[in-house]
A protein has these predicted regions:
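Active-site beta->alpha N-cap acidic-glycine motif
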Residues: 1-61, 69, 73-83, 122, ...
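Alpha-helical scaffolding segments of alpha/beta enzyme cores, especially the outer helices
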Residues: 14-17, 40, 44, 72, ...
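Structural preference for beta-strand elements that scaffold enzyme active sites
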Residues: 25-27, 51-53, 91, 113-114, ...
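C-terminal domain-boundary segment and adjacent tail
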Residues: 36, 161-190
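A short acidic, helix-capping loop that chelates divalent metal ions and anchors anionic groups
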Residues: 60-65, 153-157
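His/Asp/Glu-enriched short active-site or ligand-binding loop at hydrolase and phosphoryl-transfer sites
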Residues: 98, 103-139, 179-189
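Active-site glycine- and acidic-residue-rich loops that bind
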Residues: 121-130, 155-165
């Protein structure tokens, strides 16, 4: 499980309770501006053993940024997340997943690996809990990286209540089917 655009209360808090109850680890791709506003959530995520990764300093389309702007965003975002979490940040998912070879090169120069997803239920559109769950189940495969959202761009945050409710159902269904949940770095090492 991966979560983008947070941390953002109350959704990240609710999500952490579910993950802790079910003893599931996840990877949180954070917008560093959101992390700065909610350092207590970053600390809580790290303390619970989840992986923290960079989504961006600001939630902007990297393909529309100059190389200098990309570098500045990545370096600042990484620095903020490492300071707040105490973790070494090694992964980044550019906003919207938009990337090209220049973006990938900039990430690599900053010690980061680009990560996208393989299951995308489009939860940010709030299609309903059952639709989110059904879309995940339809796309699911061993080694899947599931993209969900616990926040949104710093300027606007839609409700993530449907996502939070869907996470409980997803975890229970997938555990019943014999799936295990690991962080992205753990998955990459397998």
């Amino acid at each position: 499980l991966t979560f983008d655009d947070g941390p953002y209360p109350p959704y990240t808090d609710e999500l952490l309770k579910i993950l802790e109850q079910r003893q599931v680890k996840a990877t949180f791709f954070m917008v560093a501006e959101n992390a700065e506003k909610h350092p207590e959530l970053v600390a809580k995520i790290a303390a619970q053993g989840h992986e923290i990764a960079l989504h961006a300093l600001k939630h902007r389309d990297f393909l529309k940024l100059s190389l200098a702007e990309q570098q500045k965003d990545i370096a600042a975002g990484k620095r903020i997340l490492e300071k707040l979490s105490g973790q070494k940040i090694t992964l980044m998912r550019p906003p919207h997943g938009f990337r090209d070879w220049a973006v990938i090169d900039t990430l690599q120069k900053n010690g980061l690996t680009a990560v996208n997803w393989s299951v995308i239920p489009r939860d940010w559109t709030n299609p309903g809990v059952s639709v989110i769950v059904d879309r995940i189940m339809e796309q699911l495969h061993p080694g899947a990286i599931i993209l969900l959202h616990d926040g949104d761009s710093p300027k606007y945050v839609a409700s993530r209540e449907e996502t939070i409710q869907a996470v409980s159902v997803i975890i229970d269904k997938l555990c019943a089917e014999g799936y295990n949940f690991v962080t992205v770095n753990e998955l990459m090492q397998k």
